[in-house]
């Protein structure tokens, strides 16, 4: 007869007195899903045989990548019967709070910036975590005595308290060295060509890539950073990374790629609509991975990834950020509500139902390519990427306009005769969709976006201008 007091790990039934504890405990031998993206999400699959796969850390028991280091961090300090105090943007301290009872921890307090979203704040309270809000940025400076990190350290030194310290405790990357890295290698072996992660504490990159580079010395490694003044949860700007003590720089083989909130949320939305319920930091890493692949192809080195997998990390789910998707992407990214009831749409009572959001059509790379070959092209191309990206490569005939200046550009344009059609271009489609929506709202009627952005254009091998390259301007880089 089966002993029901045993934890049945083979069939993932966690039974007996320690069943819940064993379910929550990270396990290297229970594989976190690795899912290859279909061609609808991978513009390089058919053209270059480059595969993109997502490591779905959102499928862990606590729903986020930080639950791995959180468990290791708690076990690295004497936390039993103590009050844990931790500075965290959300998922680390959330996980600590949910591990607390099974590990015999008295209580957990989060020290957080007052810029935290309401959704994240309520999630912590839902988990029974005490919250101390302090002044300061969402990504605090570990060396600032007034930052949430320093405050958590001081509180952790008080009697009965402890501070695990995710920003400088090597238990953070060790969790990924023990679990994430070996799993990815077991799942792909030598078919792994590049590993990409968003950079916050850098623990995921340092631990995972640190292990992978030992077994695959030729592995390419990329880090993704946040564009300044953009809200993407859990990740830092390149300047903010100077405050991190882990040795992340020596692991990278690629230049840092900066992604903004619009591309992060839009890329996440693309994955959600294919069935992967991942959050904005997942879209952030995905968009960064696509940009790195595009850069490698444009440098003439696409063959080094041919037949290989590029793996990026999905840190958490979309559910804590639902309101932010609508706020950042705007209503044009979502289906209209057909309200045939007698009352207002729930949650939209104050809105004017006749004031419908602008709908933006896209143009395929093939259609735009055929147009620019004409003597008098129909479309004017507006590239809203950063100047650095534009001067690295761009579509012939395009004009660079800063995304942050689109409102001024459109306001000036609407005072002239509007007979032209404008195609907005970015690396994917997130930023260009938002820019086109702004222009249309101001009064520029004939606006479109390039489907798939410059990533899709490059994947097709269409002509690009390469100011920083010695290659001929009109020769496709394959």
Specify the residue positions occupied by each region the protein language model found.
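PLP-dependent amino-acid enzyme catalytic core
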Residues: 1-367, 380, 386-404, 420, ...
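A short acidic-Thr-Gly-centered motif at the start of a beta-strand
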Residues: 369-377
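Alpha-helical scaffolding within the catalytic cores
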Residues: 407-412
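Compact, charge-rich alpha-helical regulatory domains located at protein termini
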Residues: 415-423
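Mid-chain, well-packed structural core segment of small domains
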Residues: 427-428
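Histidine-bearing beta->alpha loop at or near hydrolase active sites
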Residues: 452-456
């Amino acid at each position: 007869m089966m002993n029901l007091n045993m934890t049945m790990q083979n069939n993932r039934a966690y039974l007996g007195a320690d069943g819940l504890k064993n379910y929550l405990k990270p396990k290297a031998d229970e594989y976190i899903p690795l899912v290859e993206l279909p061609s609808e999400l991978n513009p390089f699959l058919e053209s270059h045989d480059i595969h993109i796969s997502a490591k779905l850390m959102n499928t862990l028991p606590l729903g986020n990548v930080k639950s791995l280091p959180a468990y290791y961090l708690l076990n690295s300090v004497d936390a039993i019967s103590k009050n844990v105090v931790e500075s965290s943007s959300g998922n680390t301290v959330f996980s600590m709070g949910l591990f607390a009872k099974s590990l015999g921890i008295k209580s957990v307090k989060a020290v957080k910036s007052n810029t935290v979203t309401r959704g994240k704040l309520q999630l912590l309270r839902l988990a029974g975590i005490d919250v101390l809000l302090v002044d300061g940025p969402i990504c605090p400076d570990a060396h600032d005595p007034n930052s949430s990190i320093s405050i958590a350290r001081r509180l952790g030194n008080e009697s009965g308290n402890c501070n695990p310290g995710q920003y400088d405790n090597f238990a953070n990357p060790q969790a990924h060295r023990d679990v994430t890295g070996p799993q990815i290698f077991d799942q792909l072996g030598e078919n792994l060509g590049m590993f990409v992660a968003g950079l916050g504490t850098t623990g995921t990159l340092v631990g995972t890539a640190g292990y992978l580079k030992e077994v695959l010395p030729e592995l390419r490694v990329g880090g993704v950073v946040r564009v300044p003044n953009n809200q993407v949860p859990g990740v830092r700007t390149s300047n903010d990374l100077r405050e991190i003590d882990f040795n992340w720089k020596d692991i990278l083989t690629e230049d840092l790629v900066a992604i903004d909130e619009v591309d992060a949320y839009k890329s996440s939305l693309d994955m959600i609509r294919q069935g992967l319920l991942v959050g904005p930091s997942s879209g952030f890493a995905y968009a960064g991975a696509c940009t790195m692949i595009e850069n490698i192809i444009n440098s003439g080195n696409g063959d080094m990834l041919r037949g290989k997998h590029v793996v990026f990390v999905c840190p958490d789910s979309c559910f804590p950020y639902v309101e932010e998707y609508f706020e950042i992407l705007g209503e044009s990214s979502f289906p209209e509500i057909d309200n045939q009831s007698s009352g207002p749409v729930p949650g939209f009572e104050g809105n004017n139902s006749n004031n419908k959001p602008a709908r933006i059509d896209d143009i395929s790379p093939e259609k735009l390519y055929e147009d620019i070959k004409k003597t008098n092209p129909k479309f004017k191309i507006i590239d809203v990427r950063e100047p650095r990206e534009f001067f690295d490569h761009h579509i012939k005939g395009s004009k660079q306009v800063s995304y942050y200046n689109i409102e001024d550009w459109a306001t000036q344009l609407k005072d002239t005769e509007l007979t032209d059609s404008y195609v907005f271009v970015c690396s994917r489609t997130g930023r260009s969709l938002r820019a086109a929506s702004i222009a249309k709202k101001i009064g520029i009627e004939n606006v479109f976006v390039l489907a798939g952005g410059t990533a899709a254009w490059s994947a097709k091998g269409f002509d690009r201008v390469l100011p920083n390259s010695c290659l001929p301007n009109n020769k496709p880089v394959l």
